[in-house]
Amino acid sequence: MSYPYQIKTLEAYHEAYKNSIDHPEKFWGDIAENFTWRKKWDKVLDWNFTEPKVEWFKGGKLNITENCIDRHLAKNADKPAIIWEPNDPKENHRIITYKQLHLNVSQFAQVLINNGVQKGDRVCIYMGMIPELAIAVLACARIGAIHSVIFGGFSAQSIADRLDDAKATYIITCDGAYRGAKDIPLKSIIDDALVGNTTIKNVIVCTRTRTAVSMLKGRDLWWEDEIKKVEAQGITSVDAVEMDAEDPLFILYTSGSTGKPKGVVHSTAGYMVYTNYTFVNVFQYEPNDLFFCTADIGWITGHSYIVYAPLSAGGTSLMFEGIPTFPDAGRFWDIIDKFKVNILYTAPTAIRSLMSFGLGPVEGHDLSSLKVLGTVGEPINEEAWHWYDENIGKKKCPIVDTWWQTETGGIMISNMAGITPGKPGWATYPMPGVQTILVDDKGLEVTTIEEGLYRGNLCITQPWPATIRTTYGDHERCRTNYFATYPNLYFTGDGALKNELGQIRITGRVDDVLNVSGHRIGTAEVENAINMHAGVVESAVVGYPHDIKGQGIYAYVIYTGSHAQDTHGSAEMIRKDILQTVTRIIGPIAKPDKIQFVSGLPKTRSGKIMRRILRKVAEGELNSLGDTSTLLDPAVVDEIVKGVI
């Protein structure tokens, strides 16, 4: 497969960028011609950022799975589409060709049809990182059902909230999942999530861990039994349902600055075109490259760069079930050596974690197949960038530092491997079609330069094809979250620096959202969970610098129980109890790293918590707390400083 829209020189990047901003309809219309359509569009773009309304390839008809699977069958039926490496290195890996993927997706699509799933139905997927997860996602897309994948680390309560919000009618899960040395009982977590649920008709359960599970007659079905029924029907191919360009493809829940996670909705055509375009250009993907994205499909990175983009490009995507440190810290390097991986796309958290083991685990591995390295999820610190460059890339592989979000669908700011220059710690240049602007808190463009840098809140001025379309069931929330802070701009929630060359460095969130190990967690969400613990009066959560995770979670907790402040042992028990509550309500990814018991929180006279002060204390910047005289009770700050962990 060739990619006529692949940028090959720096001059071509600048030309493409200019064309994309000056003539977005022509630019994206020309790229979209390279895909399979049932009917071409009537209009490339219709938009405003006030409602907001964003429509790409309006009137176009297609199915994304015809672009990810069917169109490759004529010439590449026997090419590996997905290579799967299991959690346990002693277990055999699996190779799924495009021909097999077509069969697997068709048969599971028929399973869904047999059980009454229709176009527009919401199907929740809660599975481990096995090929059946990708197959389930694509089978939903094939019949026009809207998939909503939930990361396997979320609790029953978190799942229940998402099922309720999406009004999901079907669930696809596994008996259990392997993650390093742990077995996660996915089906029993789903059972807990379904207590009191009235919308779910069926739960389809795929066998992975052979964990004993409860199966309810009339509701729960085994994946394998349902496939056997389809085989008995003699069905080997299912026609893809024709979708409108703007039909929803999936819902993916992400944390916001308020407590309730929001369901980000992506559409079909724009998402397909944009993820493919960024994949081919950022990584300079060649048709026979093996691409290894280490993310989980439960996050946007896995949706876009394990499933949809590599497959729409006719590429080969490596999917890994386990974690980088199991059975030892050489696992990534084993996989790269074993399969001769060409492109590695991972998170700074993983790199920092592997750095802490030293070079022993890297030694003895042949990493010479690597051509491009990438990072995603959070800004990469320079120390980790240099370690990655020297020890993994051997100073021969460009590192693409990609900035984007669940809401943007695909990569927004990044150097292109070997084409545009990289810079340690900098995401550098925006993708074609992405017009950035830095604004001050009033929404005015930052025009003053300090020490060669512009500093402000990062916004986008015009739509790109994979722009968020809405938050599921609540369009007003989409407007207020992203398009109301600064009128006619998409507000990213991130702060940034820009140099005189136009290169951008992301400095981190400017709202009440934490970035922990590359995963977004809302402070309000964690506070709500802590506050549900018996004995907790109030809490405040902030981020602080963490050597491995990038940001850690620091919780200040007012506890009424008689023994929070007495002996260390009792306080420690309460800490553990609170952590257990957070795990139950949200999941282990949201557990605070530090809990400090306090008698009060720094509040203004109007009752607002001064998080700025709490952040400074958590960061250890005790000499720059600023003016505390406006606080209701300034003495609270002294007490907090004395008890800092």
Each model region followed by its residue ranges:
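Conserved ATP/PPi-binding loop(s) of AMP-dependent carboxylate-activating enzymes
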Residues: Y429-G433, L444-Y482, I521, L622-N623
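AMP-binding/adenylate-forming catalytic core of the ANL superfamily
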Residues: I150-G176, I190, D337, L344, ...
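Conserved pre-ATP/AMP-binding loop-to-beta segment of ANL
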Residues: D78-P80, I204-V205, T211, L216-Y253, ...
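Conserved beta-loop-beta connector loops within the AMP-binding
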Residues: I437-Q462, K498-L501, G569-A571, R575, ...
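Conserved AMP-binding/adenylation subdomain of ANL enzymes
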Residues: G270-L290, I300-I343, F357-L359
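AMP-binding/adenylate-forming catalytic domain of the ANL superfamily
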Residues: V205, I548, R584-I609, E621-V644
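Conserved AMP-binding/adenylate-forming core of the ANL superfamily
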Residues: T65, I82-L138, S155-A160, M215, ...
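Gly/Ser/Thr-rich phosphate-binding loop
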Residues: I227, G315, N342-T346, M355-P424, ...
